Design a protein with these regions (language model features):
Chain A
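Interfacial loop-to-transmembrane junctions
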Residues: 277-303
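Transmembrane alpha-helix boundary signature
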Residues: 57-60, 79-95, 114-123, 153-159, ...
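Alpha-helical transmembrane segments
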Residues: 8-23, 95-108, 172-193, 260-263
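Cytosolic juxtamembrane amphipathic/interface segments immediately preceding
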Residues: 48-66, 124-125, 216-223
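Transmembrane alpha-helical segments that form the membrane-embedded catalytic/substrate-channel core
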Residues: 21-30, 108-118, 183-201, 272-281
Length: 315, 161
C-alpha cells in the first residue's frame, strides 16, 4: 500500500461518485442536442438524486431483505472497484484486489445482486428483466475476462496497475493487433454491461423491451437513488477502465500534487470524451432485437479470443 | 447513417425558445421536488387525443424535459401522475392503485376536459366520473385536447423551473 495508491484511491472514489451522475447528464445532453431538443442540463441527474433521497421510502409487499440490501451492495461493490482500479494513478490502494479477475468478478457480482432483487420483487417484469440481464451477463463476462487477459499476456501479470504501467512504458504495445482487437471486444462488453444501445435502451418507457430498467421498476425513493447512482458509477468505472487500458496517457505515476491533479483532469477529460462519443453514436443506432444480442456478444467474444491468440503468437 | 447526420445538421435545434419561468404559484410540493419531476402517465379512458399532445409536449419542439420533467415507466419512480380521460369503470381500481404506489410527495395533474369534468362523455354508462372523484387532483389542464404549451406550463409549475 503506497502513498500514491492511497491518494489515488481517495481521489478516484470522490471523482467517480461525484462525476458519474454528471457523465450521465452529459450523455443525455449530447443526445438531446443531436435530437434537436434543448436538454435538461448536465446537472439534472444530481437534481433527480437529491429529490429521490428526500422522497418516501417504500418497500413493496412481499419483498424480503434481498430487495433492501441490493442497492447498497451495488453501490458498495462498484465503489470498491472505483477505489482499487488504476484510473487516476498507476498504483492501487489495495494491490491484491486490483487484479483483473477480482475487478471483473466484483462488477459482475453487482449485476447479479440487482438481478436477485428483481426476482425478489415478485413482479412479472422484475423476473423477466432478471432473466434477460443474466443471459447478457453470462455472454459478456467471458469476453471481458478474455479481452483484458489478452492485454496481460505481454505483461505476464493479471494485476491491472501493472498492465497500465507497462503500457505507459511501452506505448507501441497499444497499437498491436492484440490490443486493438481487445479494445473492440471490450467496447462491446461495456455497451452490453452498462445497458446502452444497441443492447438495451436506457430511456425506454416500454417494459417489454427493457433489460436493466425492468429489474428496478419496484424501487422508490432513497433506494432508487442508490440504484441510479450505482448504475451511473458502473458506467463511469467501465469507461474509466477502458481509457486507462487503451489510452493511459496522463495517469499519475508519482504522488506529487501536480501529477495527481493531472491524473484527475486526464481521467475526467478522457471519460467525458468517450462518454459523449458513445452518446452521439447511440443516436444513429436502433435497439437490437433481443434474440440478435447473443450474436453481437458472440462476435465480441470471438474478437477477444483472437486477441489472446495474437498476443501469444505475435508476442 | 450519413443521411441521418445530414438531417441532424439541417434541422439543428428544433426546440422553441423557452417562455419565461412560472411565477411560484404551483402546488406546495414543487419546492420539495426542486427541479426534478418524474411523470407517470395514466390513461383512465381517454380518446388518445390528450396522449398525442403529451407526446408532443415531450417531443423536440416543446421539450418538456428541459424543465426537469421526464416520463418514467413505473409509478414507484414517479412524483407526478398525469391522468387523461374520464375515469371508466375498469380503470377506477388501477388508477387508485397507481396513486397509492407513488411515494410522497406526489402531485396529480388532470390533463384535458374529460379528466376535469368528463367532457363529452359525461353520464355515459361506462364512465364513473372525473379524475377528482377517484383521486385528489392538484393541477388541471384545460382543453380538448389541451395544447402542448399548456401541458408544459402545468409541468413547469411542478418542477418550478
Amino acid at each position: 500500500m503506497s502513498a500514491l495508491g492511497v491518494a489515488g484511491g481517495v481521489l478516484q472514489a470522490v471523482v467517480i461518485v461525484g462525476g458519474a451522475p454528471l457523465l450521465l447528464g452529459l450523455m443525455r445532453q449530447v443526445r438531446a442536442r443531436l435530437e434537436g431538443r434543448a436538454g435538461p442540463g448536465v446537472g439534472q441527474p444530481w437534481r433527480d438524486l437529491r429529490k429521490l433521497v428526500r422522497k418516501q421510502s417504500i418497500s413493496p409487499r412481499g419483498t424480503t431483505e434481498v430487495f433492501r440490501v441490493a442497492p447498497v451492495l451495488l453501490v458498495a461493490m462498484t465503489l470498491v472497484v472505483a477505489v482499487v482500479a488504476p484510473l487516476v494513478t498507476t498504483a492501487s490502494a489495495v494491490p491484491p484486489v486490483a487484479d483483473l479477475f477480482v475487478v471483473v468478478a466484483l462488477l459482475a457480482h453487482a449485476t447479479v445482486v440487482i438481478a436477485l432483487a428483481g426476482l425478489d420483487s415478485g413482479t412479472a417484469f422484475g423476473g423477466m428483466g432478471a432473466s434477460r440481464e443474466v443471459t447478457v451477463l453470462a455472454l459478456v463476462e467471458p469476453t471481458a475476462l478474455v479481452a483484458i487477459f489478452a492485454l496481460s499476456v505481454p505483461t505476464g501479470s493479471t494485476s491491472l496497475p501493472t498492465i497500465v504501467g507497462t503500457a505507459l512504458d511501452d506505448p507501441q504495445r497499444l497499437i498491436s493487433p492484440a490490443s486493438l482487437l481487445a479494445a473492440v471486444a471490450l467496447a462491446a462488453v461495456i455497451v452490453a454491461e452498462t445497458g446502452r444501445l444497441p443492447v438495451d435502451n436506457p430511456s425506454t418507457h416500454l417494459e417489454l423491451t427493457m433489460i436493466h430498467e425492468a429489474m428496478v421498476l419496484e424501487y422508490a425513493g432513497p433506494d432508487l437513488a442508490l440504484v441510479e447512482l450505482g448504475s451511473a458509477m458502473r458506467l463511469s468505472v467501465y469507461l474509466g477502465l477502458f481509457t486507462s487500458l487503451f489510452v493511459p496517457w496522463g495517469i499519475a505515476t508519482t504522488a506529487t500534487p501536480l501529477a495527481l491533479a493531472l491524473g484527475v483532469v486526464a481521467l475526467v477529460v478522457k471519460v467525458g470524451v468517450v462518454g459523449a462519443g458513445l452518446a452521439a453514436l447511440e443516436v444513429f443506432l436502433a435497439k437490437l432485437r433481443l434474440f440478435r444480442v447473443p450474436e453481437l456478444l458472440a462476435g465480441s467474444f470471438l474478437l477477444a479470443l483472437l486477441a489472446v491468440t495474437t498476443a501469444y503468437v505475435l508476442g | 447513417m450519413l443521411s441521418l447526420w445530414r438531417a441532424i445538421r439541417r434541422l439543428g435545434r428544433a426546440a422553441e425558445p423557452a417562455p419565461a419561468p412560472p411565477v411560484p404559484a404551483g402546488p406546495a410540493v414543487a419546492a420539495e421536488l426542486a427541479g426534478s419531476v418524474q411523470v407517470r402517465h395514466v390513461d383512465a379512458g381517454s380518446c388518445n387525443g390528450c396522449e398525442l399532445e403529451i407526446g408532443a409536449a415531450f417531443g423536440p419542439v416543446y421539450d418538456a424535459e428541459r424543465y426537469g420533467a421526464r416520463l418514467v415507466a413505473s409509478p414507484r419512480h414517479a412524483d407526478a401522475l398525469v391522468v387523461t380521460g374520464a375515469v371508466t369503470r375498469n380503470m377506477v381500481e388501477p388508477l387508485r392503485r397507481t396513486y397509492e404506489a407513488v411515494g410522497e410527495p406526489k402531485v396529480v395533474v388532470a390533463v384535458g376536459d374529460c379528466a376535469r369534468n368528463c367532457g363529452v362523455f359525461a353520464e355515459a354508462y361506462g364512465v364513473v366520473g372525473a379524475v377528482a372523484d377517484v383521486v385528489p387532483v392538484d393541477l388541471e389542464v384545460v382543453g380538448c385536447p389541451p395544447r402542448p404549451e399548456t401541458i408544459v406550463a402545468a409541468l413547469r409549475l411542478c418542477t418550478g423551473r
